[in-house]
């Protein structure tokens, strides 16, 4: 203490402190005389502040040690007492509460708003409380968000609705009050701010900065891993807590909406009671006039009942929505253990319409929500229904990973076991289409020989023919059918089958069913298909083999009286061998040569007829008739032997196209005439033209009015009969009573390969042309394309012209050559033919 001057040193904890006894201490007045030579430090204040009254008093009081304690002054601001204002704020009677304010030590402090409510705001909040539910803290939070969300320019009302998660009416009231108060405020913001240090370093020496940033220090050690783990745990905890807060907020909004709905329902019931609307008529009228509102979520509703996973359309009018917990859980937790599906009840119980229970209301996908997933309290029973199949069930399923599983968002209907059908091949009475293309036929295989039941053919990959089999109740009967009996003729089928059934089984009912099936098959009530291979006959080298167009059931019929029959020349073989032929290269070449020779002879005959037409009418008619008869009969004699064993058929679609392509026009025949050498193998569409009726030839008659005459008896349809070509007199016996002596000459031409048409040049002949056109079976013509029939009619179905006393230009027709209409029906000059 002897040194009068010393400098301030930092305290050293290791240095021992001196110990003084009481008698060694100097007196108090001696301390004042000690001059402590401490350098004067700058105060950091301005000169005006240093001379401030309170500051100078505090400095002087600190320097005065010898004065008494009463003279020492602590500088405090001067206070004014207002007792009336104090008593208005604090009540006079104070009672000690039973429990003081208790704060948990480790609780999270809620973030308090920076805006403080003033007196003007308190008046506004008390006034707004009467209309809406609001508290002072909620008002402070709303103003704080509006202030922090807007900078120099205040936010708009739409932006305020995005910032504030409140009702629109409350947001509008608070926003208008805030805008009004902000305009009256002179400062930039309603929240007072403390001056802080600027980041650019310009306020380093500013003494009015209240809070300064800490000096950045170099970090000498790394962060530990446990700090990162703790931080991640805190983030997870914050997320979980925020999710809980969001759930509570949503529950609060839901309960508030329920309360408003209850008030509205009560109000509606009171209005209906006052109006006397006890039966709901007024209510239904109002609902009909109301415009339909679009749903909030345009997602399909999935109705699910507790008793079944299926639902019908009767219970689809449900108007409430719920959140699908399953979809949100799948997004957050990709791996979850699926619960086992509840067992599906039988379809009989599922097919009955059931009322929707409150716990089975439809659900919707809530992926559009920006909040966390929030399950409803009454949605737990649906979790089992919506959950997928378990892993054990996948292992037990025979389909494995390809097993059928219900997909969320899809609606499934219960199957109807009482309706077995809806297939295209079933009859319309069973709910099908009855389409012929999908029909099944009784099918027999050759290797091994057995009947496989009902099947249908279709072409697979590579042109392979596949058989689709169909199950029926008679499959056990079909497998026991005798193949030899199916191919045998239809005489005493029951007796033949009785012997077979005795060897197979002794059941009488089985025998009866099988015999009835055999009768149906042989009577063509059931279609039977059996694959066959064509056989080659080389017994006669001079005969020409011919190829059948289609193997189908032979149909025979009789022509009705009053119609003229167009017959084919066929001969039946005496041998019992099969009637299947195939072409060889030599036979095909001989056949082409004969056809070309026939065409050349027909050209010569036509030119001879035209040359002799200028002479007398009767002589030309007889001469042309005799020449045609002799010429055609001579040429057909070589073809009669090739047609043995064939049965005539009516014209179908493929036969009509083949016949149309095999016939030629008059222009083509005239082109053949101009050539000196006949070129073999020339035809239309790759097929050699056969002999036929030529275009440009006309009929003549003595009575023009007879052209449109048609007998009613000839309207019926008839099948064409095969007959010998030499029996021409018998084929025209039905028309012989109509031909007069003057016009008895007939014209015979060959249509196709082996079809002969005999046309008398008389009035009766003209009368019989229309029945020829209408004589086809309607079922056969319906399957023929109109284009093929038009082509055959326009090119080849006109007969030769024979002059007479009164000539007519043409056969009754619609002048198809001039108008060229759409080929959508059968022409009047189409002649029915038979193709074998």
Swiss-Prot record:
GO function term, MF aspect, one: chromatin-protein adaptor activity
Sites of the Glycyl lysine isopeptide (Lys-Gly) (interchain with G-Cter in SUMO2) crosslink: 319, 673
Region of interest: Disordered: 335-360, 372-401, 802-829
Superkingdom, taxonomy of origin: Eukaryota
Phosphoserine PTM positions: 539
InterPro entries cross-referenced by the UniProt entry: Enhancer_polycomb, Enhancer_polycomb-like_N, Enhancer_polycomb_C
Pfam families reported for this sequence: E_Pc_C, EPL1
UniProt biased composition (Low complexity): 346-360
Localization: Nucleus; Cytoplasm
GO BP annotations listed: DNA-templated transcription; double-strand break repair via homologous recombination; negative regulation of DNA-templated transcription; negative regulation of gene expression, epigenetic; negative regulation of transcription by RNA polymerase II; positive regulation of DNA-templated transcription; positive regulation of double-strand break repair via homologous recombination; positive regulation of transcription by RNA polymerase II
Function statement: Component of the NuA4 histone acetyltransferase (HAT) complex, a multiprotein complex involved in transcriptional activation of select genes principally by acetylation of nucleosomal histones H4 and H2A. The NuA4 complex plays a direct role in repair of DNA double-strand breaks (DSBs) by promoting homologous recombination (HR). The NuA4 complex is also required for spermatid development by promoting acetylation of histones: histone acetylation is required for histone replacement during the transition from round to elongating spermatids.
Family from the record: Belongs to the enhancer of polycomb family.
Name of the protein in question: Enhancer of polycomb homolog 1
Lineage: Eukaryota, Metazoa, Chordata, Craniata, Vertebrata
């Amino acid at each position: 203490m002897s040194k009068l001057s010393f400098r301030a040193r930092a305290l050293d904890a290791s240095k021992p402190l001196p110990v003084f006894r009481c008698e060694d201490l100097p007196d108090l007045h001696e301390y004042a005389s000690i001059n402590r030579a401490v350098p004067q430090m700058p105060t950091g204040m301005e000169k005006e502040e240093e001379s401030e009254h309170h500051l100078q008093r505090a400095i002087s009081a600190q320097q005065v040690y010898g004065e008494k304690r009463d003279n020492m002054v602590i500088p405090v601001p001067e206070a004014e007492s207002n007792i009336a204002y104090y008593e208005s704020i604090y009540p006079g009677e104070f009672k000690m509460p039973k429990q003081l304010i208790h704060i948990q030590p480790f609780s999270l402090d809620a973030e308090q708003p920076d805006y403080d409510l003033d007196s003007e705001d308190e008046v506004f909040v008390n006034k707004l409380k009467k209309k809406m539910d609001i508290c002072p803290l909620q008002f402070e939070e709303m103003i704080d968000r509006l202030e922090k969300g807007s900078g120099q320019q205040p936010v708009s009302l739409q932006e305020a609705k995005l910032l504030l998660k409140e009702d629109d009416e409350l947001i509008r009231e608070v926003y208008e009050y805030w805008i009004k108060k902000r305009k009256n405020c002179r400062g930039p913001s309603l929240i007072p701010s403390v001056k802080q240090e600027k980041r650019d370093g310009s306020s380093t020496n500013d003494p009015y900065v209240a809070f300064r940033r800490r000096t950045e220090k170099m970090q000498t050690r790394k962060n530990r891993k446990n700090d990162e783990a703790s931080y991640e745990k805190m983030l997870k905890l914050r997320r979980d807590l925020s999710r809980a807060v969001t759930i509570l907020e949503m529950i609060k909004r839901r309960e508030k909406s329920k309360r408003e709905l209850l008030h509205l329902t009560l109000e509606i019931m009171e209005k209906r009671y006052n109006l006397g609307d006890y039966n709901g008529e007024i209510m239904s009228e109002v609902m009909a006039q109301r415009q339909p509102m679009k749903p909030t979520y345009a997602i399909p509703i999935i109705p699910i009942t507790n008793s079944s996973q299926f639902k019908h359309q009767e219970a689809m009018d449900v108007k409430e929505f719920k959140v699908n917990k399953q979809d949100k859980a799948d997004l957050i937790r990709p791996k979850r253990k699926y619960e086992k599906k509840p067992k599906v009840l039988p379809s009989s119980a599922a097919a009955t319409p059931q009322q929707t229970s409150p716990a089975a209301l439809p659900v919707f996908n809530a992926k559009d929500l920006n909040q966390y997933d929030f399950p409803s309290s009454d949605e737990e029973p649906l979790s089992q229904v919506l959950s997928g199949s378990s892993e054990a069930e996948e292992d037990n399923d025979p389909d494995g990973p390809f097993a059928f599983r219900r997909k969320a968002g899809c609606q499934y209907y219960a199957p109807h076991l009482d309706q077995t059908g809806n297939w295209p091949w079933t009859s319309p009475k069973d709910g099908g289409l009855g389409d012929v293309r999908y029909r099944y036929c009784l099918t027999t295989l050759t290797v091994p020989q057995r009947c496989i039941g009902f099947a249908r053919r279709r072409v697979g990959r590579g042109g392979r023919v596949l058989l689709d089999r169909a199950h029926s109740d008679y499959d056990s009967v079909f497998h026991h059918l005798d193949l030899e009996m199916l191919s045998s003729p239809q005489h005493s089928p029951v007796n033949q089958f009785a012997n077979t059934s005795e060897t197979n089984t002794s059941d009488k009912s089985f025998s009866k069913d099988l015999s009835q099936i055999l009768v149906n098959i042989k009577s063509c009530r059931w279609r039977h298909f059996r694959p066959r291979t064509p056989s080659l006959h080389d017994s006669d080298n001079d005969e020409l083999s011919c190829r059948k167009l289609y193997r189908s059931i032979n149909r025979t019929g009789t022509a009705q009286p009053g119609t003229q029959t167009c017959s084919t020349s066929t001969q039946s073989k005496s041998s019992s061998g099969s009637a299947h032929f195939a072409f060889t290269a030599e036979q095909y070449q001989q056949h082409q040569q004969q056809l070309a020779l026939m065409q050349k002879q027909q050209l010569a005959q036509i030119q001879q007829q035209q040359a002799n037409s200028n002479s007398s009418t009767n002589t030309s008619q007889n001469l042309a008739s005799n020449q045609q008869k002799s010429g055609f009969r001579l040429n057909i004699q070589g073809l009669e032997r090739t047609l043995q064993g064939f049965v005539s058929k009516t014209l179908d679609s493929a036969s009509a196209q083949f016949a149309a392509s095999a016939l030629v026009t008059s222009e083509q025949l005239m082109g053949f005439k101009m050539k000196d050498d006949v070129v073999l193998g020339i035809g239309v569409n790759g097929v050699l033209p056969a002999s036929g009726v030529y275009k440009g030839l006309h009929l003549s008659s003595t009575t023009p009015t007879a052209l449109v005459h048609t007998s009613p008896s000839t309207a019926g349809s008839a099948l064409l009969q095969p007959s010998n070509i030499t029996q021409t007199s018998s084929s025209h016996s039905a028309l012989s009573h109509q031909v007069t002596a003057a016009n008895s000459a007939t014209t015979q031409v060959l249509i196709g390969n082996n079809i002969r048409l005999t046309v008398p040049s008389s009035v009766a002949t003209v009368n019989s042309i229309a029945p020829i056109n209408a004589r086809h079976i309607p079922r056969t013509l319906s399957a023929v394309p109109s284009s093929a029939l038009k082509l055959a009619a326009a090119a080849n179905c006109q007969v030769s012209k024979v002059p007479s006393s009164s000539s007519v230009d043409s056969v009754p027709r619609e002048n198809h050559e001039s108008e060229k209409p759409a080929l959508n029906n059968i022409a009047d000059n189409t002649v029915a033919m038979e193709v074998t």
